[in-house]
Amino acid sequence: MMNSRERMIKALNHQEPDRVPYDLAGTTVTGICKGAFLNAMKERGLSTEYDAKEVDPISQIVTPVEETLVKLKSDTRRIGARRVIDYEKIRTKEGSVWSLVDHWDCLWKLDETKDFYYNQFTHPLEQYDSITEGLKHWHVPDWADYVDRMKADIAEQAPFLGDYCGIADRNCAGLTEMSLRIRGYEKWYMDLLLDPEGAEELLEQITQHKIDYWNSLFDWIQEQGLEDKIQVMSECDDLGTQRSTLIAPDDLRRLVIPRFKRIWANNKKRMPHAKNFMHTCGSVRPILPDLIEAGLDIYNPVQFTAKDMDLKELKQEFGKDLVFWGG
């Protein structure tokens, strides 16, 4: 019988392993929402405990404790920064409502009586006439300010890599997602036409933030001699809706995909043996060839209910280039 890492390496190289690999909580996009997790564990008679350092509190995604991951036979283990730095320290509660301002200066609130996750209430650049004007007063966080806290967190994660497929995971949402969070949804879409230079500058700052994060993570992994335990490098950007891409495919090819190409090239240079993973929801078939050309190896979540996302057709057209990772 193969161990988890051997099993995953086979599958990631388009070879047949001893069984289909299974991933639970190997990334922040393949985890499980807190409410669903609690119900599922109670139903199965398993522990309802989860990692107290919640990896993605905004989406209320939790990581089951190691004992549960072992019982559920998850082949993956995550290593990476928390999505909200110092979450337990910065959140406050008034009545049934939890509030926090993250290190991107976004205000989030969750009402325990009705919400399944945090909702965003403010955007740091929404008050300005343009992104260009806003960036004179606000800038993307400098990742160097958070490296020490990341190191403390990943030092606790590293012992659980074992013989599993280690996944180096991102520290924030994707390039378009972060742009939307920072500027606000309606204004960002308008800025693509009214302030294209500002929109590109914001994307550029987020790209550099991500590269700085990845390099700091790889530095630590290599200092600890753990690089052989890492098989996947996980990024994310929801580029699709149920019916189409989020913006025109040509705009994604011009604005977003070249920047992911830079991120993935950097990551491949640092960890040549590991595979580039991307989570992107929705109907994204038109841009899959572009993502492949940019360096994508693994596509998640394969939202087959979206337009033009037939599983058989996707496998026939892209199966030689992409590993399909559900969830």
Feature annotation, model-predicted:
Residues 1-41, 47, 101, 110-114, ...:
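Active-site loop segments of alpha/beta catalytic cores
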Residues 33-87:
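Segments that shape or occlude catalytic/ligand-binding pockets
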Residues 37, 93-98:
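Charged, often glycine-rich, active-site loop that binds/positions anionic groups
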Residues 52-56, 60, 95, 138-145:
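Short coil/turn segments at secondary-structure boundaries
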Residues 78-95, 143-150:
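Extended, Lys/Arg-enriched charged tracts that mediate electrostatic binding to polyanionic substrates
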Residues 96, 102, 108:
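Aromatic-residue-lined binding/catalytic grooves and analogous aromatic/hydrophobic interfacial grooves
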